[in-house]
Amino acid sequence: MTDSVVRGFEDELSFIEKIDSVRYRVKKGFVPNMNVDGMIYVNDSIKDYLYEELEQYSKRGVSGFLPAVKQIANVASLPGIVGHSLGMPDIHSGYGFSIGNVAAFDTEDPLSIVSPGGVGFDINCGVRLLRTNLTEKDIEPIKEQLCQSLFDHVPVGVGSKGVIPMNIKTLNQALEMGVDWSLGEGYAWVEDKEHCEEYGRMLNADPTKVSERAKKRGLPQLGTLGAGNHYLEVQVVDEIYDKAAANKMGIDRQGQICIMIHSGSRGLGHQVATDSLTLMEKAMARDHIHLNDKQLACSRINSTEGQDYLSGMAAAANFAWVNRQSMTFLTRQAFAKAFNSTPDDLDMHVIYDVSHNIAKFEEHNVNGRPKKLLVHRKGATRAFAPHHPLIPVDYQFTGQPVLIGGTMGTCSYVLTGTELGMNETFGSTCHGAGRSCSRNKSRNNLSYTDVLDSLQAKGISIRVASPKLVMEEAPESYKDVVQVIETCHKAGISKKSVKLRPIAVIKG
């Protein structure tokens, strides 16, 4: 049942304690049955968004999703949670879990749960960054042609269909093998998988746990960008903060061209989440799981429903990695054609590929001893520290690259993981700017022609499949990504490395 405790705003604030300039504790008692405190990483300007949302809720009660602070607290009431229920600076309300929520559950506790709402509907929505040996001066004379070539090569938009040949047999292989399938089919370079989180393949994936309906939705969508906040951007290295880390990534100068691909598991992942939520809602009564919010539907990790979800989620995650790999292949083709060269000669190597929506078994220290945890990251990015065994050899001394997409027309960032982040946030940080208003409000308040004109005024070439959806993704709809990045940097949970400025945007 949805949390029914509605207090006055000042009473609500009495449960929120400022620890320092970027940390706020949400104390037990804020909602019923909290097992741990919440911890939210925000500075003063971002905090105002959360407080305003909470104040509106205090006056009017539930309308749509609960406020993000309430959602952080409700997650803190879930069985088996350890540490804190964590909110990153780009936090905003979502389905069950807020977007920007990180929560870890002790696998030794038989009551611990897995929740699809803690991963999200777009399983393994994530970002990939490629570098090149090109500069902005190389791009400028043919920028419009390149933009059009990318738009022509990479299928975009709500109903877009992929150009990668796929049948149900090869789909099942892709669901099981991830980027290993792409490698076997000639869509990947050997070193591409080395620079992917999980090496582009979750080994617990089981295609039989993905419904026929989900497969039917995913079959035509492999190698497609989709719509919403997904994009392909040509970017310029605008600033280098950490030369050693940047050099390890193959970024060695301002003006260098990179390409960022932001996409996920499309309709297949959405259906996996929907199917699991339906099954878990039925299983909760059997397992005597009582929730503050029914959107937190979950199952014990070791239950049939929990294991089936994790296997299906892993398969959907593999689909997303194959999807980004397929678009990498198409992007390399577009650049090679535009510059009458080869992707290899253009040095189009993958810097890294990260997931923003996923649940994974990881080992972390809890109260001074190592524990195997199921870490849910929803709208958050893994950010492992230097010397961690799960990051590539190339990044052992600098920490894992963390890819943070800005809003349409604003800068993106590459960060690196830190030891403090390992200790405080289970090696996690932010994932983007984070919405500041709803899609509906954006559509009502903004004109798509104004948004497109604004991008062109900044010298950004753009191709959009659905121009009228552009308002939803306008910078005005989001928090300031600079504030988000600076908050994470100041908190020490990730470290700034590179700033990237967009010069061409492809959107659905």
Swiss-Prot record:
Catalytic activity reported: a 3'-end 3'-phospho-ribonucleotide-RNA + a 5'-end dephospho-ribonucleoside-RNA + GTP = a ribonucleotidyl-ribonucleotide-RNA + GMP + diphosphate; a 3'-end 2',3'-cyclophospho-ribonucleotide-RNA + a 5'-end dephospho-ribonucleoside-RNA + GTP + H2O = a ribonucleotidyl-ribonucleotide-RNA + GMP + diphosphate + H(+)
Enzyme class: ligase
Signal peptide stretch: none
Entry protein name: RNA-splicing ligase RtcB homolog
InterPro entries: RtcB, RtcB-like_sf, RtcB_euk
A cellular component term, taken from the record's GO annotations: tRNA-splicing ligase complex
EC number(s) from the headed UniProt entry: 6.5.1.8
Positions with a binding annotation for Mn(2+) 2: C125, H262, H356
A single MF term (Gene Ontology): GTP binding
Residues the record marks as active site: H431 (gmp-histidine intermediate)
Source taxonomy: Eukaryota, Amoebozoa, Evosea, Eumycetozoa, Dictyostelia
Sequence similarity: Belongs to the RtcB family.
Keywords from the UniProt entry: GTP-binding, Ligase, Manganese, Metal-binding, Nucleotide-binding, tRNA processing
Cofactor(s) of this protein: Mn(2+)
UniProt record, GO biological process: response to bacterium; tRNA splicing, via endonucleolytic cleavage and ligation
Subunit structure, as described in the record: Catalytic component of the tRNA-splicing ligase complex.
SUPFAM superfamilies per record: Hypothetical protein PH1602 (SSF103365)
Keyword GTP-binding part of the UniProt annotation: yes
Residues that coordinate or bind Mn(2+) 1: D122, C125, H230
Residues engaged in binding GMP: 229-233, 356-357, 405-408, 412, 431-434, 507
